[in-house]
C-alpha cells in the first residue's frame, strides 16, 4: 500500500485522490499527509475582477486546478476586505458591499467554506451577560454539544431549550420567541443545527 501511495504522490497526485477503499483511507489518514486534507484555493484578485465578475488568466487556471483536484475555489480582493474591516456601522458596510455587488465579505465566505470542508458547525449559548459560540462536528447530537461547554453537561444531559440565531436577531427577545412558539425543548437524540442557540 505504501509503495503504491508513494508512486501516486510522485506522479503529482494528492493523497486524497489515492483510494476509495475505506480501510486504505484510514491507514493513509493515520500518516497525516497534508494532501490528504480537504483544500480550499483562494485567489486574491483586483477590484476590477470583483466588479466585472470576470476571471483573469491566473484565477481561471487556479479555478481549473482546484476543480481538477476536487477542491473548493474562492476569489476575493484583499484591498476590498481591508476597506470592509474599517467600517464600524453595519449600514456603511452593507452600502459598500452593494457598490461591489457582493452579498457578503470574502472573509465570511472563507470561514463558511472552511467550516464546511472541516465538517464543522456553530451553535450558541446565551445568558444575560454573555453570548458565546461553540464549534462542533456537523450532525452532532445535543449531548455532544453540551459536552463542549462542560463534560458534566454531557453526562447529565436530559433536554435543552432550543431556538435559532436568526429568530433571536429578528425578534430581539426570548420572551417574544416563546410567545411565538419558536423555542422548543429537544432531547438526547436531537441533531444540533448550525446557528442553534441552546
Where are these regions (language model features)?
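C-terminal-of-GTPase-core extension/linker across diverse P-loop GTPases
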Residues: 1-191, 198
